[in-house]
Amino acid sequence: MLFAVIGHPIEHSLSPLLHKISFELMKVEAEYVKVDVPPHRLGDFMSSVDMIFNGINVTIPHKVEVLKYVDVADDLVNEVGAANTLKIKDGKIYAFNTDVEGVRGSIKDAVDPKGLKVAVLGAGGAARAAVVALRDEAQVTVFNRTLEKAKRLAEELGVDYAGLNEVDKIKKHDIIINATPVGMDGVSMPIPPDVIESRHVLMDMVYRPLYTPFLKVGLAKGAKTVNGLKMLVIQGMESEKVWLGASPYWRDVYERLLASLA
């Protein structure tokens, strides 16, 4: 069996290593590769996937655009408006979204979100997954630099919204999720450090670096932190359930992946 992750750029992806560890744990004979697909090549790539791959993970910037090329999308894909997992069977392409469970599982490993106030920073695809993951149990507010974009997302998904500069509002939340790329450079923060308090639970959807400045400040202040690698592993195991009907316990894969990166 052959699986792949597609995106652009893709060289930073840890998905091949993650799935290699998982396949070895399950004693599954399969390969997992990364394929750099620039946006203008997506159509060409998708036209031949059914002859090559059993399943595909989709990352930035293709999670929305790829929906043009699938035959069947599940309800969650339609709700989020994006897919990160494709299953190819009998010449048909089926689309799924496991990012939602990636967020939900990561947060629930740290805290029960029921009834808590959640601030989601950002209004892109990652933010959509975070909102859908938590809106049924928690009070979710989308904070974004461009207020109009936050408004559109919030109204579509039935949650509140505010500007990213409204830091006093952000501070009043229990869980703060960074769903922006800010912090990938190892220097930048999506919000000022003084917004973060010890009572907060912080999650960063960025997984490289493993501890972004956002999470480092949280750790220094005694806040609970959830790194993006945990989400990557949980969504990856959910993808394997789609493809193979089973997956190892995510924590076993997570610990092995952490050790291999040390």
Swiss-Prot record:
Q: Name one GO biological process term.
A: aromatic amino acid family biosynthetic process
Q: Does the keyword NADP apply?
A: yes
Alphabetically list the UniProt keywords: Amino-acid biosynthesis, Aromatic amino acid biosynthesis, NADP, Oxidoreductase
Active-site residues are: K63 (proton acceptor)
Its annotated pathway? Metabolic intermediate biosynthesis; chorismate biosynthesis; chorismate from D-erythrose 4-phosphate and phosphoenolpyruvate: step 4/7
Q: Which residues form a coiled coil?
A: none
Q: Which reaction does it catalyse?
A: shikimate + NADP(+) = 3-dehydroshikimate + NADPH + H(+)
Record-listed NADP(+) binding positions: D75, G122, A123, G124, G125, A126, N144, R145, T146, L147, E148, K149, M205, G228
Please tell me which top-level EC class this enzyme sits in: oxidoreductase
Q: Where is the signal peptide?
A: none
> What terms describe the molecular function in GO for this protein?
NADP binding; shikimate 3-dehydrogenase (NADP+) activity
Per UniProt, shikimate binds at: S13, L14, S15, T59, N84, D99, Y207
- EC number(s) on file: 1.1.1.25
One Pfam entry for this protein is Shikimate_dh_N
Q: Which domain of life is it from?
A: Archaea
Q: Which family does it belong to?
A: Belongs to the shikimate dehydrogenase family.
PANTHER family the record matches:
BIFUNCTIONAL 3-DEHYDROQUINATE DEHYDRATASE_SHIKIMATE DEHYDROGENASE, CHLOROPLASTIC, SHIKIMATE DEHYDROGENASE
Q: How does it assemble?
A: Homodimer.
Entry protein name? Shikimate dehydrogenase (NADP(+))
Native source organism of the sequence: Ignicoccus hospitalis (strain KIN4/I / DSM 18386 / JCM 14125)
